[in-house]
Regions:
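Multi-pass membrane proteins that catalyze or facilitate reactions on polyprenyl-/lipid-phosphate substrates
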Residues: 1-62, 73-276, 280-401
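Conserved beta-loop-alpha segment that forms the PLP phosphate-binding cup at the N-terminus of a helix
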Residues: 66-69
């Protein structure tokens, strides 16, 4: 393995490195982190194994898409703030473009699709989220206290299905975890290879908090659609713990009840997001393109994409200087453990409503779901292949029926 290289790169070099991964990194956030390790630790030698492990730990602690945040942190280490932006752009651009094109095509030619294809995509979404619930539950809810937090969180958001209920559940689970859970402190490693002053970090954290508080107020005072979209997607990007799939219930609660995107289109787009490389958060580009009223299309996609990723950039840049101290605190890690248990509950609730209730309507749907789960869990089939197979099978079932 090459030794860690401290020589800076240009933002263009960072962009091209992440663009390659954005075109090829299938498999979700855990797989993305493996791709990053192979490319930037083992092959390029940008940083050491221990420094990379620390970056991953930080980004799993923060809300937002962990793999995208690790990418931004790597870009920040190599080329400063322009490098962080270049890494984020390169990694998200391919999947965002594909999903926008899918949204535009669905709006224009969706009626021409064979009957049952969109329903097959819904069934694929059920299978993919069920796989995520199973894997995250085994990892993040290993004991009775965390299983209890998970169950209470799921029941709460099903009983009171609003975005603010989800926020309250996450906050309450964090407090409960801090009070009830016991975790081990992390032993020290070498310092992360990123130099950011505390003053600059506080500026980024302040901007993050100001936007989180002020955007909902602004959207109420000036009910312009672009401001509502900015608020909804910024808030979703600020409050998602546990990875890309957890954004599903937050975004569904924001866009479907308000009529910006109908339920069938939402689930079809979510399934399509499983079939493209890169971060699942680029689902925001699909929703922005498919939403109504304006802005939508390309401008709506760009607005929603920037809004959902902006919190990640602000948090990574703001948290890095403080992470060396915080990662040793048992109480901080216990708080995070409680939050992680809650997000499994949120995802379980989303698996039932809307995914199961709108996707599994007849025995044939359940049979197709079983085969999709078998492919994902037993045969380890890539999700994009399962999505395509379910779309084809849905069309065939509708034709035969």
């Amino acid at each position: 393995m090459p030794t860690a290289s401290r020589h800076p790169d240009t933002a263009l070099a960072v962009f091209l490195a992440f663009l390659k991964l954005g075109c090829s990194a299938f498999g979700g956030p855990i797989a993305h982190l493996g791709y990053f390790r192979d490319e930037f630790v083992r092959r390029r030698g940008w940083l050491s194994e221990s420094s990379y492990a620390d970056l991953v730990a930080l980004c799993q602690f923060l809300p937002g898409p962990a793999s995208s945040q690790v990418g931004m942190a790597l870009g920040l280490a190599r080329a400063g703030y322009p490098g962080a932006r270049a890494a984020g752009l390169g990694f998200t651009l391919p999947s965002a473009l594909l999903l926008v094109l899918f949204a535009l095509g669905l709006g224009r030619w969706g009626a021409l699709l064979p009957e049952g294809v969109l329903h097959g995509l819904k069934i694929a979404a059920v299978a993919v989220v069920a796989q995520a619930v199973w894997g995250m539950g085994r990892s993040l809810c290993p004991d009775r206290p965390r299983l209890t937090l998970m169950a209470l969180s799921c029941a709460s958001v099903l009983a009171w299905p609003t975005a603010w209920t989800q926020v309250a559940v996450i906050a309450g689970a964090g407090l409960a975890g801090r009070a009830l859970l016991k975790t081990e402190a992390v032993e020290g490693h070498e310092r992360l290879p990123i130099a950011i002053g505390y003053r600059g970090a506080l500026l980024f954290l302040t901007l993050f908090a100001v936007l989180l508080v002020c955007l909902p107020l602004a959207a109420r005072l000036w009910p312009e659609q672009w401001l509502r979209l900015l608020d909804a997607f910024y808030r979703a990007g600020s409050l998602v713990f546990g990875g890309g799939h957890v954004v599903l219930p937050l975004l569904q609660a924001e866009v479907v009840p308000k009529g910006w995107v109908d339920g069938d289109t939402f689930l079809a787009g979510y399934a399509a997001a499983q079939a493209v490389p890169g971060p699942l958060f680029t689902f925001a580009a699909f929703l922005g393109a498919a939403s109504g009223p304006a802005p939508n299309g390309w401008s709506g996609a760009l607005l929603c994409l920037l809004a959902i990723f902006l919190p990640s950039f602000l948090l990574v840049a703001g948290a890095l200087p403080f992470w060396e101290r915080l990662r040793h605190e048992r109480r901080v890690r216990a708080t995070l453990a409680g939050v992680n248990a809650a997000v499994v509950g949120l995802l379980l609730a989303a698996l039932y409503q809307p995914l199961w209730t709108e996707g599994i309507l007849r025995p044939a749907d359940f049979a197709l779901l079983l085969f999709a789960l078998l492919a994902l869990l037993a045969w380890k089939t890539p999700p994009w292949q399962v999505v395509l197979a379910c779309a084809v099978a849905g069309g065939l079932i509708a034709t035969a029926g």
